[in-house]
UniProtKB/Swiss-Prot annotation:
Record SUPFAM superfamilies: WD40 repeat-like
Lineage, opening ranks: Eukaryota, Metazoa, Ecdysozoa, Nematoda, Chromadorea
GO biological process, one term: mechanosensory behavior
Main location class: nucleus
Ranges occupied by WD repeats: 212-251, 260-301, 303-344, 345-379, 380-423, 425-467, 470-509
Key words of the record: mRNA processing, mRNA splicing, Nucleus, Repeat, Spliceosome, WD repeat
Quaternary structure (record): Component of the spliceosome B complex. Homodimer (via LisH domain). The homodimer interacts (via the N-terminal region including the LisH and CTLH domains) with smu-2, giving rise to a heterotetramer.
Official protein name in the record: Smu-1 suppressor of mec-8 and unc-52 protein
Protein's organism: Caenorhabditis elegans
Record note on domains: The WD repeats assemble into a seven-bladed WD propeller.
PROSITE patterns assigned: CTLH, LISH, WD_REPEATS_2, WD_REPEATS_REGION
């Protein structure tokens, strides 16, 4: 990843803003003096201008004390303040401002005549507004001062230093560099770096989650930040689990109150947003809902996302769109803001089984039980290429881009005993096979976070573990005696979830 250069002056300004918001004004003044870097920010430019045009000079002068402004503009400001004080017959205050403020001391040095006229105005026993203001009214002068000073200041979002620190911690959590739910010693950086775990295939079951006798998980996924394991079940419930103990997350208020997220039909697919804050779910009745995981609130619903069941959902990189594929053979893009279908991509002749955005977000990849993979232009929706893998038109079940592969490659899982590593043009680079003919056809495939291992679950209830680089089958692991449905991989640990029609969601570790 290319390095990002940060100006030292910007870092100083972040500290200065923190000092200002913490009312550490003396420290702020010393830092500005020693570094010669000024903050020059106000909470609101409109508010700053309103203070000037309203003549709230106490607030104005307090604000400009922490700003670095051109001497001429400061002299004009202080001169006008003195004039208004004289008009109000606040003569003692006017003398104090004229004799003890830096802008007026500077004025006395560089323009003695102008300063003398100001002193004369203070000493007069009367105030003649017509003589002082002339054809330019007091209000007009205030407006001019407001306009000239506003061009020197900026508005910055509050608490930028704390916000950036929070964002950096969130990024480290997303990358697996911080353990979820752990208190962080920010200064000492005790948890700032976590040893990278060597990717290894699982060898044993850690725990299992049992569903009700009339239900079973149709889908499951870990959140990118590793905080959640979410399942979607045959009866429409969407549940958030603590994968460390296999219990329902009761720290989520809505689950503690038995007010679960729910759809009207079986939840066929689930996908998290990149920041792990939102969850998209698709059901067999053609509906999609988007949830806020922390609260369980439904943020957006697409009641007619597809005319038949929804088989796959994905968030766009910026969370502004939902990509979906359905049993109606159509790939669609839905707008989060509008709640409407923005784009349709037709061409598949059977069920859509998986949809993906390419890593850069410019392309959409879809696969279908018609045995084809299509690459679409992300903006126009035009089909750029169509290809198939293998010698037979086996139904393709899912495609997974291989992380950091150059040139880009992906793993294709179809209803056979072989996985295919292909490039974006569909050329087969490598194959991985179970070698089993009877009940050896794969149903679902996942990749480890770094792309070193591919795990495929077959009709026989066995998980096959392949090393991607060599394509060799390293080990097998029986995971269910009933019909398996799918797999999900933890984003940072050697932890895999398997789910099947036996009503068990099992967690496997090394």
């Amino acid at each position: 990843m290319s390095s990002i250069e940060i100006e030292s002056s910007d870092v100083i300004r972040l500290i200065e803003q923190f000092l200002k918001e913490s009312n550490l004004h003396r420290t702020l003044a010393i830092l500005q003096e020693e570094t010669n870097v000024s903050l020059n920010t106000v909470d609101s430019i409109d508010g700053f201008c309103n203070e000037i045009t309203s003549g709230n000079w106490d607030n104005v002068l307090k604000t400009v004390q922490s700003l670095k402004l051109p001497a001429k503009k400061l002299i004009d400001l202080y001169e006008h303040v003195i004039i208004e004080l004289v008009e109000l017959r606040e003569l003692a205050t006017a003398r104090l401002v004229a004799r003890q403020t830096d802008p007026m001391i500077l004025l006395k040095q560089i323009d003695p005549d102008r300063f003398a006229r100001l002193e004369s105005l203070i000493n007069r026993p009367y105030f003649d507004g017509q003589e002082v203001y002339g054809d330019v009214s007091k209000e007009k002068r205030r407006s001019v001062i407001a306009q000239t000073l506003s061009s020197e200041v900026h508005v910055v979002a509050p608490s930028r230093l704390l916000s950036l620190l929070g964002q950096s911690l969130k990024w480290q959590l997303h990358q697996g560099l911080l353990p979820p739910g752990t208190a962080i010693d920010l200064f000492r950086g005790k948890a700032a770096q976590k040893e990278q775990i060597e990717e290894r295939y699982p060898t044993m079951m850690a725990r299992s989650i049992k569903f009700s006798t009339k239900s079973y998980p149709e889908s499951a996924v870990f959140s990118p930040d590793a905080n959640y394991l979410v399942s979607g079940s045959k009866d429409g419930f969407i549940e958030v689990w603590n994968y460390m103990n296999g219990k329902l997350r009761k720290d989520l208020k809505y689950q503690a109150q038995d007010n679960l997220m729910m759809m009207d039909a079986a939840v066929r697919c689930i996908s998290f947003s990149r920041d792990s804050e939102m969850l998209a779910t698709g059901s067999i009745d053609g509906k999609i809902k988007v949830w806020k995981v922390e609260t369980g609130d439904c943020l957006r619903r697409f009641d007619r996302a597809h005319t038949k069941g929804v088989c796959a959902v994905r968030f766009s990189k910026d969370n502004s769109h939902i990509l979906s594929g359905g049993n109606d053979h159509v790939v669609r893009v839905h707008g989060m803001k509008s709640g409407k279908c923005l784009k349709e991509m037709r061409g598949h002749s059977s069920y859509i089984t998986d949809v993906r955005y390419s890593d850069e977000g410019n392309h959409i990849i879809s696969c279908s039980t018609d045995g084809s993979i299509r690459v679409w232009h992300g903006k126009s929706g035009e089909c750029l290429s169509t290809f198939r893998v293998g010698s037979e038109d086996y139904p393709i079940l899912n495609v997974i881009p291989i992380p950091k592969s150059d040139p880009p490659q992906m793993i294709v899982c179809n209803r056979s005993n072989t996985l295919y590593v292909v490039n974006i043009s569909g050329q087969v680079v490598r194959t991985m096979t179970s070698g089993k003919r009877e009940k050896g056809d794969f149903i679902n495939c996942i990749l480890s976070p770094k792309g070193e291992w591919a795990y495929a679950i077959a009709e026989d209830g066995v998980m096959y573990c392949f090393m991607v680089l060599s394509g060799t089958l390293e080990t097998t692991l029986p995971v269910t005696e009933r019909l398996p449905i799918g797999l999900a991989h933890h984003p940072h640990q050697n932890l895999i979830a398997s789910y099947a029609e036996d009503g068990l969601l099992k967690l496997w570790t090394d």
